[in-house]
C-alpha cells in the first residue's frame, strides 16, 4: 500500500499527469491507472540489452545496481523499464519475429544481429 501511495504521488505531483485521477487501493493494486510501465525482459519489451542503454542513461551504480554481462540486474529485486503516461497506452506482446525483422531492428539499434539473437532468443521464429 505504501508503495502504491508513493507511485500515485510521483505520477500526480512530480511527473504531472493523471492529476485528477482518484483511485481506490484495489484499483491501484490492479494497476487500473492511466499509462503503462513496461519492464525490460517482459513481453512488451523483451530485449534485455535495453538495460545497458538505460544504465548509460541513469548510471545505475549510483544507486547500488549493476548489470551482469547478460543484462541481469543485481540486486535481483531490481527492475527497470519505461513509463508511458498517455491515456491510450496499452500493454502488448512483441511475439515472435522473423529474420528480416531481426535484421531491421539490429540496423536501427546499430548492434550486430548475432548479439541481439542472444537477447531475443525466445522471440525468434525457428
Name each model-derived stretch.
Residues 1-9:
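Single conserved hydrophobic/aromatic residue that forms the stacking wall/gate
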Residues 79, 83-126:
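Charged substrate- and nucleic-acid-binding regions of tRNA-handling and nucleotidyl-transfer enzymes
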Residues 11-89, 100, 119:
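Small-residue-enriched alpha-helical segments and adjacent helix-cap loops
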Amino acid at each position: 500500500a505504501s508503495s502504491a501511495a508513493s507511485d500515485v504521488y510521483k505520477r500526480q505531483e512530480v511527473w504531472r499527469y493523471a492529476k485528477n485521477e482518484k483511485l481506490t487501493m484495489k484499483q491501484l493494486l490492479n494497476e487500473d491507472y492511466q499509462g503503462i510501465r513496461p519492464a525490460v525482459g517482459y513481453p512488451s519489451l523483451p530485449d534485455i540489452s535495453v538495460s545497458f542503454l538505460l544504465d548509460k542513461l541513469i548510471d545505475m551504480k549510483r544507486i547500488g545496481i549493476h548489470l551482469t554481462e547478460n543484462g541481469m540486474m543485481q540486486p535481483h529485486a531490481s527492475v527497470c523499464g519505461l513509463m508511458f503516461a498517455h491515456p491510450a497506452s496499452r500493454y502488448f506482446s512483441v511475439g515472435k519475429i522473423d529474420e528480416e525483422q531481426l535484421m531491421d531492428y539490429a540496423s536501427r539499434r546499430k548492434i550486430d544481429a548475432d548479439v541481439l539473437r542472444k537477447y531475443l532468443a525466445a522471440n525468434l521464429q525457428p
